[in-house]
């Protein structure tokens, strides 16, 4: 009957959870007081559309609960304060068919990751949700998929994808200076980041990545000193030396005239005279 996903309140007095409808979609959010019977649980939000599903989470700065309701290409979000004794979710932006958005809060500001007037997404910023005044934070870019943000006390980290390559960018909050986070000399890799500690008062993060020639690796990375330390690496039982392989990045013209990126991985001893087999 429930989705299995729960959120504990910061005071550890309540549990927020969602209930499933007959189509196995989460459409109701309840609050359960620990120690009470479940028939006393409070319904705090209900999605009326059978096509939408709901979820609840806590903001990065732990000041708000956010309720997200969405289908495949449309979303809508509500919020209420961590300190509200009787939760009354308030609408952020009314849903609009084909528009996705996700609002997060950090350091007294609100960040909206949305495809409104931006096919490949953008990020807007506002000082308030009661009196919204959205201004550009990351503007839309031609053929660049703009990802969301991860917040630390001193840093904002975000992602971009262009030409089928993923990139990470780091912004120093105090200077507002942003630069690309380059942690490997491999151009073709798939990076991802995760928090190293919950309170976010740190300069260190975990960066995981893999590439066509390199097994999955996880590094501890210092955003201030830009130093890194390998903490985990996927073991290949048969043995593997990344230096034995060459990864090349080329582009070919498609039937519609667009250039399509192609990654070629080969052993450094492989002849490139057309005699070797190719797995495409």
Can you annotate each of these PLM segments?
Residues 15, 65, 110-112, 156, ...:
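Hydrophobic beta-strand positions that form the internal "hydrophobic ladder"
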Residues 53-81, 86-104, 136, 147-148, ...:
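Non-catalytic accessory segments flanking enzyme active sites
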Residues 12, 62, 107, 153-155, ...:
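Conserved loop/turn motif of beta-propeller repeat scaffolds
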Residues 1-3, 18-28, 47-51, 69-76, ...:
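A flexible loop/linker signature enriched in serine peptidases of the S9 family
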Residues 26-70:
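Polar, glycine-rich mid-to-C-terminal structural blocks
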Residues 277-279:
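Hydrophobic beta-strand anchors of alpha/beta hydrolase catalytic cores
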Residues 30-36, 79-83, 124-128, 220-223:
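Beta-propeller blade signature
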Residues 130-152, 161:
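Generic long, charged, amphipathic alpha-helical segments
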